[in-house]
Amino acid sequence: MGGNTIGKMFSVTTWGESHGKAIGAVIDGCPAGLPLSEEDLLVELSLRRPGRRFTTPRREPDVPEILSGVFNGKTTGMPISIIIRNRDVISSYYEKIKETPRPGHADLAYIKKYGYEHWDYRGGGRASGRETAARVAAGAVAKKLLGCLGVVVSGYVVELGGVEFPSAEDAEESLRSRLSPFRVLCCEEKAEEVLKEALERRDSVGGVVEAVAWNAPAGLGEPVFDKLKADLAKAMMSIPASVGFEVGWGFKLARLRGSEARDKIVSSAGEATVEGDKAGGMLGGISVGAPIRIRVAFKPTSSIMIPEKTVNIHTLEETEVEVPGRHDPAIVLRAVSVVESMFAIVLVDHAIRAGLLNPVRVEWGPHCQRVWELYADRVP
């Protein structure tokens, strides 16, 4: 089975299932010399961790263990292996519905591809959002590496259940979402109202995450098939429950005239740059030195307490299923950290390919540490 690895020069492979013994990631291509500890990984994992208000009540501590690739507190240039053990597993919930694939989930697709007898029905198995904890652990490594370039990657919710929330104008503002349980920049009472209503209806809501790479350098991305926006699209659409991807103004540009849809090219600080973010900081799929802005849409959580039509996979008799278990009323809240992580992983891969990051060894200085502290100082 392929499809478990992303990246060329800086690659991340995730492994494990929702109700297995553990999940984890193997990072290959991380240069030597990067200070790295399990506490660094926890900085990011704490924002994705389940068990908080308006998230799944499954209480996973998400404590990572670095098994390889780090010596005397710094990366060695060898593969970094990370394991996160599953602690709060209740597989009995799924015994009642293992013969009735859940509507909206990957159950039916996995059954058709791998066969019913090989399908791990417990909590969604490999297709579960639980897998994304491994991505966030790897994303912490990528974010630290980007600090060497002065790049900050931050995301926030701009839409929840059809209610819109503001975007950020700078890195400092965007990082405020890290302290919000709803991952919004303001108006938390509006977000809480949306989620309370969904819970009262025994339903769920979707949303949109916006993420920005601030101080991104020019030259990330290759022509044609390895464009930066193409790799970002692949990374974002690989996240469970993602259903749409935009760069800059995205689909809005399709409704404008050419005279309205272009970013101006101006002279600023002794160089040519773009004014505006309609193109999302990329032209021809290559970064131009402006902030790179993307959006990812997430569907509502499919596991809800409202019955839906399905079939018994053995008899093919139509029936209804009401999904038990512990689930998020809005997966988009915890998806923010996953979007940031995948964003950072893709940027590091392209930075190494572009020669902007040394693939063998990095020199960690005070400027790198200052960038990392922007994340570490904003943990709830």
UniProtKB/Swiss-Prot annotation:
Its cofactor is FMNH2. Reduced FMN (FMNH(2)). Disulfide bonds: none annotated. CDD domains: Chorismate_synthase (cd07304). Keywords: Amino-acid biosynthesis, Aromatic amino acid biosynthesis, FAD, Flavoprotein, FMN, Lyase, NADP. Pathway: Metabolic intermediate biosynthesis; chorismate biosynthesis; chorismate from D-erythrose 4-phosphate and phosphoenolpyruvate: step 7/7. Pfam families: Chorismate_synt. It catalyses: 5-O-(1-carboxyvinyl)-3-phosphoshikimate = chorismate + phosphate. GO terms for cellular component: cytosol. FMN binds at R126, A127, S128, G284, K299, P300, T301, S302, S303, R326. Belongs to the chorismate synthase family. This reaction introduces a second double bond into the aromatic ring system. PANTHER family: CHORISMATE SYNTHASE (PTHR21085:SF0). NCBIfam families: aroC (TIGR00033), PRK05382.1 (NF003793). This is Chorismate synthase. It comes from Ignicoccus hospitalis (strain KIN4/I / DSM 18386 / JCM 14125). The gene is aroC.
